[in-house]
C-alpha cells in the first residue's frame, strides 16, 4: 500500500531527497541532491515509536563479527567532491564501511548496511555530512590552534614549527630530528591528524634527508631561511628519493632570482606552492604565473580570501609582525609593501573560482586564521557566484553542485592528494578513515554540529551538563569522550614518511596513535587536483600588476558585506 506526502513534509521527517536543494548557511549557494541511496518508505529512523528497534529496523540476531557496523549516520546529505547524495553512512573500526541503505534486511528492502546489536546511531535527517578538512599550511605556534581548528571542521593539520619561536612565527618548519621527535610526542595528546614539514634549506642531501627519516612527511622552503635555487634543487632531490612533498614560499625580494629562476630550479618536478597570489609571500609581483605549470600544485591562504574592503588595510601590520620586520627601517616597510598588491589580490578569488588555484589553507597565526579555512573558502564561493554568476556546468541545473564540489575539494581531497595522504583521508568514500563533520544547513561552513575522528565523536555543540536534557543554553563546543584518554590514539592519525616507519620511529618514540605513511607524491601533476586542475596561460603585468588568464584580464570587486559573518558571530 503506497502513501503520498508533500516534499516539504517528507523533508521534515526524513530529510530532503533527490531533486531537492539545500541552501548553504546564508550564502547564495544551493546544493541539489543528485541521488538518494535510501528507499522511500523504508527509511531507518531512530527514536521512540520509530523504525530502528529490535526486530524492526534493527536485526537483533547478528553480532558485530557478522558485517555489522559500529555506527550508522542515518538519512544524511553527503557533500563531497565526488558528488552530492543522500544516504546512510556506516562506520566500522574507525573507517567508512559503507555508504548506502541501512536497516534490517529481514523486514526491509534494499538494505546493504545491517543495523545490529553492536550499532550506534546518529540521526542525520536534515543535516549535511562532509569529510573533515585538511589545513596544509600550519605554523605550530600555539597548541590552542588545534581545538580552534577542530571546531571549525578541520581534522588534519600539516605544517611545521616548535612553538612561539621567531622562526616558527614566520616559517612552517620543524627543523631536525630532535625537534621533529618532540613535536610527534606532543601530538599524542590531541584528537587531530598531523604531518610535519622539515627544513628545506641546505646544500647537503643527507643533512636534509635525516629529517624525513626522523618523521617529517615533507620539506618546507621559506624565503626567511633563503628560498635559493640551491635549496629548491636540494629539497626536490630529497623529495624524489623519499617520495615526500616540498612546499615553497618563494623569494619576494627576488634576491636569489626571479620567478623564471625558481621555475628553472624546480625543473618540472612536482611542488606545492603556498599563498600563490603573493600577499603571504613570493616573487613580487608575478608568483601567480607559476600556477599555469602542470607540475605546480597552487594554494591560497585565507587572509586574502575573499577580497573585501578591509583586506588591503589589515595586511601591512600583519606582515610586519609575522616576518620579524622593523617598522622603523624603510627597507623593511618597502619589503612589506611589495607584497600587498590590490590587482593580484583581486584576481585571486577568480583564479580559485576557475579551478586554476587548487587549494585553500590558513597560514595559522602567521598571516592566517586557523579557524576560518572552511568559512572563508565558502565565502569566496558565494562572492564569485554573486559576481560571476553560475558556472557553465551549473547552468540550468537548479543548483550550484559543480561550484560546491570544486570548493569543497580545495580543503579536503586536494591537500590530501598533494601530501600523499588521500588513501586515508580527504573524502567521504568507503574504506577511508572516518573523519566526518556533521552540519545543520543553516550553520554549514560556520559552526559544525558534531565532529567525528576515526568514527568517534570528539567535539560538538552541547548544552548545560547539569540540565535534564542535552539542549538547554548555554550551548557551546565541548569535548566528547573520543577526545579523552587512550581513545585519542584510536581516533587520530600521525602521518610519517615511509622511511621513518621503516626506521622504527613509532616504536622508538612510543607513539600510540594510528600511523599511516605518505605516498605516491612524486608522480603527481596538477591534473590530480580534483576539479581544480586548470592550467591556462597566466601573465602578470610588471608595471600595472594586472593579471591575465589566456589574455583576458581577471579581477573582482571587494565585498562590503559577507555571508557567514556577523549573523553568526558576536565578535
Curated annotation (Swiss-Prot):
Pathway(s): Nitrogen metabolism; urea degradation; CO(2) and NH(3) from urea (urease route): step 1/1
Regarding protein family, the annotation reads: Belongs to the metallo-dependent hydrolases superfamily. Urease alpha subunit family.
Cofactor note (record): Binds 2 nickel ions per subunit.
| Family annotation (InterPro entries) | Amidohydro-rel, Metal-dep_hydrolase_composite, Metal_Hydrolase, Urease_alpha_N_dom, Urease_alpha_subunit, Urease_AS, Urease_asu, Urease_asu_c
Could you describe the post-translational modifications of this protein? Carboxylation allows a single lysine to coordinate two nickel ions.
Q: Which SUPFAM superfamilies match?
A: Composite domain of metallo-dependent hydrolases, Metallo-dependent hydrolases
Q: Name one GO biological process term.
A: urea catabolic process
Report the EC code(s) recorded for this entry: 3.5.1.5
Protein localization: Cytoplasm
> Catalytic site residues?
323 (proton donor)
Which residues bind substrate per the record? 222
MF GO annotations: nickel cation binding; urease activity
Residues that bind Ni(2+) 1: 137, 139, 220, 363
| Assembly notes | Heterotrimer of UreA (gamma), UreB (beta) and UreC (alpha) subunits. Three heterotrimers associate to form the active enzyme.
Know the name of this protein? Answer: Urease subunit alpha
Amino acid at each position: 500500500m503506497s502513501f503520498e506526502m508533500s516534499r516539504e513534509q517528507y523533508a521534515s521527517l526524513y530529510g530532503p531527497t533527490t531533486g531537492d536543494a539545500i541552501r548553504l548557511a546564508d550564502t547564495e549557494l544551493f546544493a541539489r541532491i543528485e541521488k538518494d541511496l535510501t528507499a522511500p518508505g523504508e527509511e531507518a529512523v531512530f527514536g521512540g515509536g520509530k523504525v530502528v528497534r529490535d526486530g524492526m529496523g534493527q536485526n537483533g540476531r547478528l553480532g558485530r563479527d557478522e558485517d555489522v557496523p559500529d555506527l550508522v549516520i542515518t538519512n544524511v546529505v553527503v557533500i563531497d567532491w565526488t558528488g552530492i547524495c543522500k544516504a546512510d553512512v556506516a562506520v566500522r573500526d574507525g573507517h567508512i564501511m559503507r555508504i548506502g541503505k541501512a536497516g534490517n534486511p529481514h523486514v526491509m528492502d534494499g538494505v546493504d548496511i545491517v543495523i545490529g546489536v553492536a550499532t550506534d546511531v546518529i540521526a542525520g535527517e536534515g543535516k549535511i555530512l562532509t569529510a573533515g578538512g585538511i589545513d596544509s599550511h600550519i605554523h605550530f605556534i600555539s597548541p590552542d590552534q588545534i581545538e580552534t581548528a577542530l571546531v571549525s571542521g578541520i581534522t588534519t593539520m600539516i605544517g611545521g614549527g616548535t612553538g612561539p619561536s621567531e622562526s616558527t612565527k614566520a616559517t612552517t618548519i620543524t627543523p631536525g630530528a630532535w625537534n621533529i621527535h618532540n613535536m610527534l610526542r606532543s601530538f599524542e595528546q590531541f584528537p587531530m591528524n598531523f604531518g610535519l614539514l622539515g627544513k628545506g634549506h641546505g646544500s647537503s642531501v643527507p643533512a636534509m634527508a635525516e629529517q624525513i627519516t626522523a618523521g617529517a612527511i615533507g620539506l618546507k622552503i621559506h624565503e626567511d631561511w633563503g628560498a635559493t635555487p640551491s635549496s629548491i634543487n636540494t629539497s626536490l632531490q630529497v623529495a624524489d628519493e623519499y617520495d615526500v612533498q616540498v612546499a615553497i614560499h618563494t623569494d619576494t625580494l627576488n634576491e636569489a632570482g626571479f620567478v623564471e629562476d625558481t621555475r628553472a630550479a624546480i625543473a618540472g618536478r612536482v611542488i606545492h606552492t603556498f599563498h600563490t597570489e603573493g600577499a603571504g609571500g613570493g616573487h613580487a609581483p608575478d608568483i601567480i604565473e607559476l600556477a599555469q605549470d602542470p607540475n605546480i600544485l597552487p594554494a591560497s591562504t585565507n587572509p586574502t580570501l575573499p577580497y573585501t574592503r578591509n583586506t588591503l588595510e589589515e595586511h601591512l601590520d600583519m606582515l610586519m609582525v609575522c616576518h620579524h620586520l622593523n617598522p622603523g627601517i624603510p627597507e623593511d616597510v618597502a619589503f612589506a609593501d611589495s607584497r600587498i598588491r590590490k590587482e593580484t589580490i583581486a584576481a585571486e578569488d577568480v583564479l580559485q573560482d576557475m579551478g586554476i588555484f587548487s587549494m585553500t589553507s590558513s597560514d595559522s597565526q602567521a598571516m592566517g586564521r586557523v579557524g576560518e579555512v572552511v568559512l572563508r573558502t565558502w565565502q569566496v564561493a558565494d562572492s564569485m557566484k554573486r559576481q560571476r554568476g553560475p558556472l557553465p556546468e551549473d547552468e540550468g541545473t537548479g543548483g550550484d553542485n559543480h561550484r560546491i564540489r570544486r570548493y569543497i575539494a580545495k580543503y579536503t581531497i586536494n591537500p590530501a592528494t598533494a601530501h600523499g595522504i588521500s588513501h586515508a583521508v580527504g573524502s567521504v568514500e568507503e574504506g577511508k578513515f572516518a573523519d566526518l563533520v556533521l552540519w545543520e544547513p543553516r550553520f554549514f561552513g560556520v559552526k559544525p554540529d558534531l565532529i567525528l575522528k576515526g568514527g568517534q565523536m570528539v567535539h560538538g555543540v552541547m548544552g548545560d551538563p547539569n540540565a535534564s536534557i542535552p539542549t538547554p543554553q548555554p550551548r557551546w563546543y565541548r569535548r566528547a569522550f573520543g577526545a579523552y584518554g587512550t581513545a585519542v590514539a584510536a581516533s587520530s592519525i600521525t602521518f610519517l614518511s615511509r622511511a621513518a616507519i621503516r626506521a622504527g620511529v613509532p616504536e622508538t618514540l612510543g607513539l600510540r596513535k594510528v600511523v599511516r605513511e605518505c605516498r605516491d607524491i612524486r608522480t603527481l601533476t596538477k591534473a590530480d587536483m580534483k576539479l581544480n586542475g586548470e592550467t591556462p596561460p597566466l601573465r602578470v603585468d610588471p608595471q600595472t600588476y594586472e593579471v591575465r588568464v589566456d589574455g583576458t584580464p581577471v579581477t573582482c570587486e571587494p565585498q562590503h558585506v559577507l555571508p557567514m559573518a556577523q549573523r553568526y558571530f558576536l565578535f
